[in-house]
Design a protein with these regions (language model features):
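Catalytic alpha/beta core domains of metabolic enzymes, predominantly
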Residues: 176, 183-307, 312
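Structural signal for hydrophobic packing residues in well-ordered secondary-structure cores
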Residues: 37-40, 63-66, 70, 89, ...
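Short catalytic-loop micro-motif centered on adjacent basic/acidic residues
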Residues: 43-47, 70-73, 139-141, 201-203, ...
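A mid-to-C-terminal "edge-of-domain" accessory segment
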Residues: 5-6, 10-12, 247, 253-425, ...
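Short, ordered loop/turn segments at secondary-structure junctions
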Residues: 13, 48-49, 74-77, 101-103, ...
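Alpha/beta enzyme core
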Residues: 6-8, 18-43, 56-65, 79-200, ...
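Short hydrophobic alpha-helical segments enriched in small aliphatic residues
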Residues: 428-431
């Protein structure tokens, strides 16, 4: 029996960037987009084109340079936003306009100051306008989980009839419970005519620590797209963690018999790159990619792991791209060992650049016992030389997709298109837009 395919929609570059202190400029977004392409995500939400010139250029530049995945741009349900989004996306090989509009009574009354009838008409009209530019249109009813259920059905019916190809159900404030969220998805599948022709998506926030649990409940109820971020970064307490969702399905196919195109061995490099770009450390006990995720201190656990790793590990470090922990870097380590670990983290240097990093490494290694990955990333961040990623052409991925078990191929290299863009701040949006600019 063929396993159902789950579409992975990565919003690290849009919602993830809304995490305090995690803004990225155009160049950094482009680097991260190439890493997401290596990872094999299906959709990259590259930004919010109306928000700033930087976001516009990021969406435009990523659409020109990253050709395999769908490239999405966010837009409010108004003509100016939708037209600006299309202007940024029209050069992409596979563009998607993602339109959102708040639908809960509290948002309609206090933020938008419109009636339910006006909300319906605005949603319907915005989807029709977006479809006039683009065949792939996603609609999100912001704060869907606090929206009156009957009105949510009415709203989703309106946008499906207007031509939306994906309907995303956001738990915008992380309010719902897993069983409840699954019931919402099931309700829409039962009550909305034509919903079987539309992809149902989820977008869960982590305010109660339930973003991944809610996402998994929605998958079980019939959702077939998951919106998530690397390291779970995002507004307030963050978003559903991409690495946790992917590995939950991979480790428990008995409960979640679904496939994704994600090449899981690129999860750790993606996590480390994002941490380096945003200068935000990954918490040590973070599931899947934290420093302690495969660490064992208790004697009984250590004994079990030495005899058979499966006694206390439900996945291998290699399956998520964690470098070989047997290579310990210290003050006696040479350039070759340092260079190898940097390559495992996704960095490759010319000799002059490696020398500068190595000089700083030796100084640090004299001060601490072991130099770990987060120390190396800090050294790289502080080094004034260029620190390019390993070129895509150097990354070899089996056509069968190494260690994924999915059968969905991720290309070994992605064609680079000429890109001439000025670097702008990706978050120059203050005093230009309404307070409700950032949504979903």
């Amino acid at each position: 029996m063929e396993r159902a395919r789950i579409t992975v929609f990565d919003t690290t570059l849009r919602d993830g960037e809304q995490s305090p202190g995690c803004s990225m400029n155009v160049h950094e977004k482009l680097r991260m987009a190439h890493q997401l392409d290596r990872l094999g995500v299906d959709v990259i939400e590259a930004g919010f084109p109306i928000a700033s010139e930087g976001d516009f250029q990021a969406v435009k530049g990523i659409g020109a340079a990253v050709r395999r995945p769908i490239i999405a741009g966010l837009a409010r349900a108004c003509a100016l936003d939708i037209e600006r989004a299309w202007e940024a996306l029209k050069g992409a090989a596979r563009p998607r306009i993602h339109v959102f509009l708040a639908t809960s009574d509290i948002h309609l009354k206090y933020k938008l100051r419109i009636s339910r009838e006006q909300c319906l008409e605005q949603a319907r009209g915005s989807v029709r306008l977006a479809r006039s530019f683009c065949n792939d249109v996603e609609f999100s009813p912001e704060d869907a989980t606090r929206t009156d259920r009957d009105f949510l059905v009415q709203l989703v019916q309106a946008v499906v009839d207007a031509g939306a190809t994906t309907v995303n159900i956001p738990d915008t404030v992380g309010y719902t419970m897993p069983a409840e969220f699954g019931e919402i998805i099931q309700m829409l599948r039962e009550r909305v005519r034509g919903i079987e022709n539309v992809v149902i998506s989820t977008h869960c926030h982590n305010d109660l620590g339930l973003a991944v649990a809610n996402t998994m409940a929605a998958i079980a109820a019939g959702a077939r797209q998951v919106e998530c971020t690397i390291n779970g970064i995002g507004e307030r307490a963050g978003n559903a963690s991409l690495e946790e969702i992917v590995m939950a399905m991979r480790v428990r196919p008995d409960r979640y018999p679904y496939d994704t195109a994600v090449a899981s061995e690129h999860l750790y490099p993606a996590s480390q790159m994002l941490s380096e770009i945003t200068a935000t450390p990954v918490q040590p006990n973070k599931a899947i990619i934290g420093r302690n995720a495969f660490a064992h201190e208790a004697g009984i656990h250590q004994d079990g792991v030495l005899k058979n790793p499966l006694t206390y590990e439900i996945m291998t470090p290699q399956s998520v791209g964690v470098p070989d922990s047997r290579l310990v870097l210290g003050k006696h380590s040479g350039r070759h060992a340092l260079s190898l670990r940097c390559e495992q983290l996704g960095y490759q240097f010319e000799r002059r650049e490696l020398d500068e990093v190595y000089r700083k490494f030796v100084v640090l290694a004299d001060q601490i016992k072991n130099v770990e990955d987060h120390h190396l990333l800090q050294l790289i961040r502080e080094t004034r030389v260029q620190t390019p990623r390993i070129p895509l052409a150097h990354v070899e991925i089996s056509p069968a997709v190494i260690a994924t078990g999915t059968g969905y191929a991720v290309p070994a290299a992605v064609e680079r298109h000429p890109l001439e863009i000025t670097l702008h701040s990706a978050h120059d949006h203050h005093a230009e837009q309404e307070d409700y600019l950032w949504g979903v």
